[in-house]
Regions:
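Glycine-centric low-complexity repeats
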Residues: 1-165
């Protein structure tokens, strides 16, 4: 299930739960909860689960939660699941930062043994003081997935790095 949202103005978002293993398609990771209104970090997205069977497809990673408006880092995206006989799951997106804070890193794409690797998730962006999140690495497969792009840095910060192909 999805992580719950932060329940006050100073509370961080709760992480999303991991997806359950599937006989064909793995369960998707839950989204990370958003932080409280003003202050707090976004919750991390849950990991996608393994997809089993001859054509198993990995579950997608959950997206990272958004930080509070003023202070806080974005949540990291969850990793995509392994596709046992099929495609790997996509990595989750990194969450957006507050005015002060770093963007969340994107999740790595899952590997697929019988099909395409999962795409890495894009890093979350920063606004004022903070660096963009790094993009998730691509999953291996036939063909490999696409690497996630780094998030935009704040006015006083650097852009995140792209994931590895």
């Amino acid at each position: 299930g999805n992580g719950g949202n932060g329940f006050s103005q100073t509370t961080a978002g709760v992480a999303g739960g991991a997806g359950g293993v599937g006989s064909t398609t793995g369960g998707a990771g839950g989204a990370g909860g958003n932080a409280g209104l003003l202050v707090g970090a976004g919750g991390a997205g849950g990991a996608g689960a393994l997809g089993g069977g001859a054509t198993g497809v990995g579950g997608a990673g959950g997206n990272g939660g958004t930080a509070g408006l003023l202070f806080g880092a974005g949540g990291a995206g969850g990793a995509g699941g392994f596709g046992f006989g099929g495609a790997g799951g996509a990595g989750g997106l990194g969450g957006k930062a507050g005015l002060i804070g770093d963007g969340g890193d994107g999740g790595a794409g899952g590997n697929g043994t019988g099909a395409k690797g999962g795409d890495g998730g894009a890093g979350g962006g920063a606004i004022l003081v903070g660096n963009g999140g790094n993009g998730g690495n691509a999953g291996s497969g036939t063909p490999n997935g696409s690497a996630g792009t780094g998030g935009a840095g704040g006015l006083l910060g650097k852009n995140g790095m792209n994931g590895l192909p």
